[in-house]
Amino acid sequence: MVEKIESLLTEMEFYCSEKHPAGALLLTGEWGGGKTYFVVNKLQPHLKDSHIFIRISLFGIKSVNELQASIKKKWIECIADYIAMSKIDVGATSKVFNALKPFAKACVDTFIDTSVPEGKQGIAKSLFSISADQLITITNEINGKIIVLVFDDLERSSIPFGELLGCINEYVENQHFHTIIIANENTIKKRENEHSGASETLKYNEIKEKVVERQLEFHNDPLEI
């Protein structure tokens, strides 16, 4: 089992390090199997020096607009946290600001001395004081670190799968984000068959093929987590 987990970690690390991924990575497995735990507590720490992971739970999200707003909010939270918690000097902080254009100037205008902890707290506060919808275009890299979007609970979203996967594909294909989708695919197919018939399941599979570059099955021994 350890070998399987290590192999899975290697495959996911390879995907996250691809220069130009052709699609998303789908990690599927049964509920309670440890998929999210694996990504958050194994993969993320393993790549902490080169990647920033942004996890968005799709549970309870009812529209594409709500999802897009949630992604922007999570992006700002992660970047603000990165700036506030990193041991970076003023020069390094300036490089981050350059990457955070066009709202960097609005932040700088409100900052105090950024070389002290209070200044770093000011960075986070300033980021949250800005209207993300109006001023921000999220980027797939920040200060040399690759951003990985993690969409969790695919099967628990209220958004029709066609719209949902189409939205995710926008980040994958057009904005070139490394993207991990965590799902219980058996539940998705069962639900589609029960409520919409086989044609809808086929539709899900067809759309998935356009969005997903590779699919990995997660089978974990509870004793391993």
Predicted regions and their residues:
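Conserved small helical "lid"/interfacial subdomain of P-loop NTPases
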Residues: K210-I225
